[in-house]
């Protein structure tokens, strides 16, 4: 079931030792039972209702971009640098420097990003809320955020928590001698927790998320419940570096990192700081969400010794990787390859590794006592970089070529903390690097004169007279725009990547039909552009959307309504060279209920996948409902199947879908021939009238969806249906147009 959940994971492999974290049970027996408890198979619509706009205390008119652009970013950076070395008695800084703590905080904020659904990442600042704020892997990051509060308090609405959590780690690296390639603001704060599928385990640090061949279930990225990436002691606590390498490769890959980026991130990240395991985890109190109210949001209260400083317990692992924990160096790679490592246990009982050579026992300074020295440590996941043949080759190259390593780490770090932000057009601030990177899904700038209203009307006429049908035009526009994901702002119609690999070959897009439509539209585009004397052009990306709009206007006219579907030109056409095929493969729809398409490899039901798709498109329950109803009567199903086309006038935009679905003249039965298909029979004659999928019938079966369907099936709802359909359509068509605000339709009956 889709249970208001969504996965995310990452590991600044400062990770967590499962042996030190007790499971805190939450008694539920005395809690009122939810509808989901009583009826667990009930379709959960809550993903379409979060976040709730009324939760935002800043109000609907608040413009974060304007506030951030008025911020003195250099002043914030200077304040952060001062904070780094101003140790507080209530949480003393290791080596007198909070920099490594802030790097871990930033990493764990951004590193929850995952490629398969774009969920996770630093946007929203969700590390402040449950469950992230209480994950075992995020132990003591509550202190890092509290250290930042005076700066957040000083600059207020001009910098979000989401941006500050990332900026702090970036500044920390710069202050400790590493040159980053920049920073972009633009992450807006969330004001409430959202429910995401982090896995189905019922206990922290369990791992029951592998399929039959041992791969992580999609869309999950972390291997263990409550960890960002992987268990640093090795899979299931077994200290096997090669097995750890397999898990690292899988989970970092699901965070959009290749092998080189993975090695750079681990080797670069572990150049700073230390792990903390002064004693057993039995001394730790509950995580923030389970702690007493008097703790005021702090968790993991430590009863061992002073409970802080030298007595800190975080992961259960203990020690630093390098001789310069607060200064950038290449000592991590030097130590990794120069020593033979032997297995040992930390004071907290976690498995880790130290040099076989006893002469290394005094290399590393103590974090608090200048008279003490220690041996460097490595974790099982660190040794993966030495023993995995692919990782080892990369790591040795970095060791021999320090400048190449510096550049690789800077780029991988920038990608890590910006991957969930979408295109560069959303980046804010003076520190944005000028270089365009392929993972940003670039599109060309508009370097030509855009079409005007007369041109648009002329082009719509040519499209409608081209021989292309309403379903073909609607399906093509939908296929192009509906790749958008509001989670990581990827996809959408801009770029016209539907004509490029891999999108042109996706089964959901009816490749043969799509090729025919694109060929016709390209001909119209070329004829128009070649006829212009003033440099005016229309992009194929714009023409695809315009074609869908024109078809909808024609379909509404057939129903007796004259409408103008709002259209704003300005999209451009990306090239294949601007498109990372592998990166775009994860956007392929394995189900699209709006087109009645479903790949049976999915582990969720078709209605659940519809809700997930609508959630990614940032649609509400009514918007999802009206779009499905409209797409059905427009005959826009994949493969030209007729499931759910409850009308005798396909291609006409009307509310027939809802009227016929809710009619008691039809009796529905499961098909005896095709699994997942339902047949609707006339109650009086017994004649077969309709065929449908569970996506179609859910709008009559689910009580909440039925209520919305009824609103569109009433005699006085015809105008409203068309108005709402067009508005929802435009919302999808412009979802990736961060430069405009969607307009509402004009309708005359």
From Swiss-Prot:
Formation of the three residue Trp-Tyr-Met cross-link is important for the catalase, but not the peroxidase activity of the enzyme. There is a cross-link at residues 229-255 (Tryptophyl-tyrosyl-methioninium (Tyr-Met) (with W-107)). Keywords: Heme, Hydrogen peroxide, Iron, Metal-binding, Oxidoreductase, Peroxidase, Signal. Its EC number is 1.11.1.21. Heme b binds at residue 270. Residues 1-27 form the signal peptide. It catalyses: H2O2 + AH2 = A + 2 H2O; 2 H2O2 = O2 + 2 H2O. The record marks 104 as: Transition state stabilizer. Pfam families: peroxidase. Bifunctional enzyme with both catalase and broad-spectrum peroxidase activity. Homodimer or homotetramer. HAMAP family: Catal_peroxid. This is Catalase-peroxidase 2. The gene is katG2.
